[in-house]
Structure formats: structure tokens, C-alpha cells
Amino acid sequence: MAIPEFTMRQLLEAGVHFGHQSHRWNPKMAEYIFGARNNIHIIDLAQTVPLMHRALQAISDTVAKGGRVLFVGTKRQAQDAVADAAKRSAQYFVNSRWLGGTLTNWKTISGSIKRLRHLDDVLNSGDASAYTKKERLTLQRERDKLDRSLGGIKDMGGLPDLIFVIDTNKEDIAIQEAQRLGIPVAAIVDTNCDPKGITYLVPGNDDAGRAIALYCDLIARAVIDGISRAQGDSGIDIGAASRPLREDLPAAQATGFQGLSGPRGTPDDLKKLTGVSGDIEKKFNDLGIFHYWQFAELDHDTVLQIGEEVGLPGRADGWVAQAKGLTAEAE
């Protein structure tokens, strides 16, 4: 894998060079504007190309180090592209209304995510029959409302390491929260936007559907490149990793790790570990891992084997240190 390649012709065909009407411009974007045609500002793609490459490299590097990327695009024409790109690259997204405090008040957001998970469990289990039709409808509406806002981040397990934004004017609250927390921001910045505070600025049209689809595709491919690099750095045979384990090998035997038959008391929230989603947590449970202290006691080779077993070899390196910290907090 490598950083995704693209050409200036692709940018032109997608309409990336079209800015806003010249009277709606932000003077701070002057250095990125080539000129004006029919009162429409034309973005200088000779600058967009290297700046996009820089952003793609930063995103790939972030993921290669085990980081999480949050895609943010709540405008109508960006919603589907943002969600599809995030899902395709196993990352996270917000494509409905940004809830104030999503980053800066993560503790409260985590509580809402727990509520969403609880509603999912209730509505998808036999317990739903214990409620009246009206009560089930009320629960379903609450669940749908939470899912629209939090469905794309319910498996994130913590703050992202970088956010990618379409339309910095519309997503200004998200950007402000990221800046307060020191989280890098990669963003498409149109001629009517303020480039201040954007870590990886990419001048471009943030309204055209084709342009947005191109941006999201490039970012998703950069993320996938980072995942591949992480696997390569860990010495994982990516081709072999794509083949299923032999069915006659029990999971514990495949990893050389002896897990527990069940949790000792209340299981810990393993989704707090880097890159761990709800599905990965279930795989840990299948291996007999329910608690932080189990990770804290593992040696380097064993945790890498477990990471390979659950499909996250590139992110396993930091789990032991994280688990030790979480164990100490719990005590």
C-alpha cells in the first residue's frame, strides 16, 4: 500500500477549483485563490495538490501509530460520503448534528452512548416483548434519535487522534473543541472560510457532491494505507492475516493465551483500549479476556498475538500500558 495518488485532472473534473462568489470570500484565503471568473473565485489547485498530499500523509501516519480518525460532515451533500468512507476504513464519523461537547465533554457523551447500547440490547432481545407497543415505540424513537447523533462514534472508545472536516464554517464547533484539546484537524477549506487553526488545510470546493466524494475516498484510502503500514511494522504477513485461522484450533490455543471462563465480577469496558470496538470487545471475551488487569499482565509477544487474533495487530502495542493505567484508576 502507499499514500493514494490523484491528479490535478481528477480535481478539475470534480470541480474542486470552484470557490464561492467573489463577494462572499474570506480575505484570509487570498493566498489560495488563483483568480476570479464570472464573479466566482477559482482556487489555485497548484497549492491544493501538495497540501492534500500532506494531509493524506498525516492521516496515514496517525493511523499507522494506532490512532483513530473521526470524519465530520453534517451538511446534506456530505452525509453519505462521510459515513461510507468512515465505515470502509474502519473509522468513526459524525454526519448528523454535532452535539456540543462531543469532544470536550466526552464523559457525558459516553453516558449517552451507553444508553444507546442499552436500547439496542433491549430492542434486539426478547426483553422487548415485556413492553407495551406504545412503550416500544417510545424506546425506538429515543434509540433512533441517539443513533443519528452518536451511531458513528459509539464504538470509538475514546477521543480521536485526528479529525477530518468537510466545511469548516458549518463544523466550527467541532473544530473549536478539537483545538481546545490539541487534536489535529485536517479540513477542506473553501474561499468563504477562515483557515485559522486548521492543522492540515486543503483549499477546495466544500459544496460539490463529486468533490466531497473524491476527498472522502482519498482520506479513506490513506487510513487503509496506515492500517497496512501498522501491520507491516508489526511483522505481520498481511496476506496470511487475510486467511481465516484453522477451524480446528481453539482461540486460546492459537494465541498461546489461557483466558478466563467468565468475568470475575463486573467486566471492564475494554472499548477504552485504542482501536477496540464493540465487535473487538466480543472477540476478547471469546478469548476469555474481560478485565484490564489481564492485559496488564501480558508480555509483548502475547499481546501482539492476541492483536493478530482479533484483527488489530497494529494497535496491540499500546494495550498493556493503557490497561495498567486503567487498572490503577479502577483501584
From Swiss-Prot:
Gene3D superfamilies: Glucose-6-phosphate isomerase like protein, domain 1 (3.40.50.10490), Helix hairpin bin (1.10.287.610). GO terms for cellular component: cytosolic small ribosomal subunit. The gene is rpsB. GO terms for molecular function: structural constituent of ribosome. SUPFAM superfamilies: Ribosomal protein S2. It comes from the Bacteria. This is Small ribosomal subunit protein uS2. PANTHER family: 30S RIBOSOMAL PROTEIN S2 PROKARYOTIC AND ORGANELLAR (PTHR12534), SMALL RIBOSOMAL SUBUNIT PROTEIN US2M (PTHR12534:SF0). Belongs to the universal ribosomal protein uS2 family. CDD domains: RPS2. GO terms for biological process: translation. Keywords: Ribonucleoprotein, Ribosomal protein. It holds the Pfam family Ribosomal_S2.
